[in-house]
Amino acid sequence: MRTLSLLLIWATGTLASDAPRLRALIVDGVNNHDWQAGTRGLRQILEATGRFTVDVSTSPGREAPATAWDAWRPEFDKYDVVINNFNGGHLEDGLRWPAPVEEALLKYLRRGGGLVIFHAANNAFLNWPEYQEIVGLLWREPKFGPGLIVNGQGRVETIPAGEGPKAGHGPRHDFQMEILDPQHPITQGLPAKWLHPSEQLTHGQHGPAEGLKVLTYAYSKDSKRNEPMDWIRRYGRGRVYTTMLGHTWLNEPNPNYDCVGFQTLVARGIEWAATGKVTIATPSELPAPDHAVLRPLGER
């Protein structure tokens, strides 16, 4: 049986009290998931580390008039890291940001900014070519481009374009996360394998699939393959961290956000995207292959 322990505080020494805080901006507003719950959970996780201050820029709604979109201009350059929690759809007619906002994000990244692609945000912007390059692997048809898996020897293997299953997922469930690169600052000190509760395990990602460093993976019962869960890449001088974790759905509990493994991995990934370094320590109690450890975030 899965053992669920409750952690009330981060490990002592996670962050020096006088260390400067990083400025994080979460962008949300449209998503097929419960993006309000996702944004609240992310904010709580980041603020609990003491390393971040967090602002939110919520876009107009899908049916908002052009005047509302014309007035929406997130100021990316004010922040150390931008977290994308926006998904306008994964089809050709998916909702895009206004051209000035897209160009501002590209300039921000090219100049050395940090970007996080959070869960369903990797589904977005099929009709924005630069976005495919930024993310590397996305919710796309097999014909779109190559895919990546982790083979039985722990090596990343390329699946040619046109092959492999379509992007998809089964119902949320507990599954085992595995660390592919234990020496990277984001994953260093985390257990080699740990149980993550009640999460959506996405399979069949495709894209340019170039220049990625896969950090974690999980075995999908649907695709019968080891699927990348977290990865990083560079875009210009900028740093991009993608996590497929963080599923939320309307009128469903989200114990995956209470998972200490998830909280630690995501907070460190966001810090790396912001600075290229990681100072957030691992908590004193960590999950194991057969049990999760939970630190409740409270009502989301």
Regions found by a protein language model. Give the residues of each.
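Positively charged n-region of N-terminal signal peptides that target proteins for export
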Residues: 1-4
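Short, solvent-exposed loop/turn segments at secondary-structure junctions
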Residues: 31-32, 88-89, 122-124, 192, ...
